[in-house]
Amino acid sequence: MSDITTLSLTALRDKLARKELSAVEAASACLARIEATEPKIHALLHCDAEAALAAAKALDAAGPNPDQRLWGVPVLVKDAICVKDAPTTCGSKILENFTPFYDASCIEKMRAAGAVILGKANMDEFAMGSSTENSAYKVTANPWDLGKVPGGSSGGSAAAVAAGQCFAALGTDTGGSIRQPAAFCGTVGIKPTYGRVSRYGLVAYGSSLDQIGPLTRTADDAAAVLGVIAGPDPKDSTCAPRDVPDFEAALAGAADLAGLTIGLPDEYWGEGVDAEVRDACRAAVDTAKSLGANVVPVSLPHTPYAVATYYIVAMAEASSNLARFDGVRYGYRAPEAQSLEELYELSRSKGFGPEVQRRIVIGAYVLSAGYYDAYYRKAAQVRRLIRQDFLNAFEKCDVICGPTSPFAAFTIGQMSDDPLQMYLSDIFTISLNLAGLPGLSMPVGLGTTSAMPIGMQLFGRAFDEATILRTAKVLGNALPPLPQPAAV
């Protein structure tokens, strides 16, 4: 791996500002890394080297600009986020020929901040999956072990950051799709508070759950990117009209956790968590104590109902959102269709993969007459109870902590035939989306059995991303750094 591509985003930014590196050199290093690693990990669906180098040359011609906080930084974007003139497929055949004519709001902000967009990252189809095996185009491998999954649905973004293909990647998180792949690939991934980042230009899966966020190498890097993409947006009515704090300033000089109270929910530390995961996360909590944090027990009693609640709500919203893909206006159109009815039926049955079809059918069922009250309405009520659990817990602590996933990255194909087991892999991440609160996954070591990265999750109060970022920075600096992934 090039010395350049092993740098953190903030370290690269400093070198660019001092003109020790040019934007073209940074982009070229990442493109070379993509060329070397992509045949192994298959993290990307689209890479436009020509456009990236042209953008980097334009930046170099203008010179470093301190007002552009990502000046010259090469980044990748999950393929559910619209990038003008770049294919945006959502990992689905039904959108195989779709090219947006506009940038998503977060992409506009990234460009304005000087970021160089290299391409689009692979993902589970329409963000429905936990392994990136559901992509219609390729299966992404974990850079730590090419036989293991990178997690999902933002697996391409996580794998690309871990492999040094970019310095940051945007992902989306509907039920853990940033945090779980971050845990599996040994990166930092943050899901902001619902409404912190505009969803304009994001192809929707579950509109009340989806959030865009960064995957990076360090908490400082995540703070830098989040500070750019966050903020109000008149094009998204669900985007909160709140000022964005200076996340980087909030992290500056952070050296200990004195005065911080961390809550440990019993429901996240019991049976069902692999011993290597529990041990690594417990050791990280002990380190937090040594840094001055106070640790207290808390309870999130409705956690056992979270998986069922999430999948009812998410599938209902998906069935509604994906009704627009019909072969008429854009996307895949079945050429053999002889009638309008056949056009709808064949385009959707051939354009959508099996997992997406499963979720659409279940979602339509729970919304149908006679079943709405039995399923969707009850799920909405339990969702409110889950949120209240967090509000009650945060009366006793500042941050809630637990494993990101019950296990480390699993073998490709291991859960493909058991969708219910795959759904359970999100058991510790989905509650936060139902509650609309911010969460971050950070690496805390390698598993003693699997030798794969272990991720620990930090939950924060609404719009208090700064506290979990600061906690992750201080704790991350105190823990032994992970080595570079050996498989690439």
UniProtKB/Swiss-Prot annotation:
| UniProt-recorded Gene Ontology molecular function terms | ATP binding; glutaminyl-tRNA synthase (glutamine-hydrolyzing) activity
Q: Which residues form the active site?
A: K78 (charge relay system), S153 (charge relay system), S177 (acyl-ester intermediate)
What the record says about family reads: Belongs to the amidase family. GatA subfamily.
Domain of life the protein comes from = Bacteria
InterPro entries on file: Amidase, Amidase_CS, Amidase_dom, AS_sf, GatA
User: GO cellular component terms?
Assistant: glutamyl-tRNA(Gln) amidotransferase complex
Record EC number: 6.3.5.7
Query: What biological-process terms (Gene Ontology) are attached?
Result: translation
Protein name listed in UniProt? Glutamyl-tRNA(Gln) amidotransferase subunit A
What keywords are annotated for this sequence in UniProt? ATP-binding, Ligase, Nucleotide-binding, Protein biosynthesis
Q: Which gene encodes it?
A: gatA
Q: Which PROSITE patterns match?
A: AMIDASES (PS00571)
Which catalytic reaction applies to this protein?
Answer: L-glutamyl-tRNA(Gln) + L-glutamine + ATP + H2O = L-glutaminyl-tRNA(Gln) + L-glutamate + ADP + phosphate + H(+)
Q: List the disulfide bonds.
A: none
A Pfam family this protein belongs to? Amidase
Q: What is the role of this chain?
A: Allows the formation of correctly charged Gln-tRNA(Gln) through the transamidation of misacylated Glu-tRNA(Gln) in organisms which lack glutaminyl-tRNA synthetase. The reaction takes place in the presence of glutamine and ATP through an activated gamma-phospho-Glu-tRNA(Gln).
**Quaternary structure per UniProt?**
Heterotrimer of A, B and C subunits.
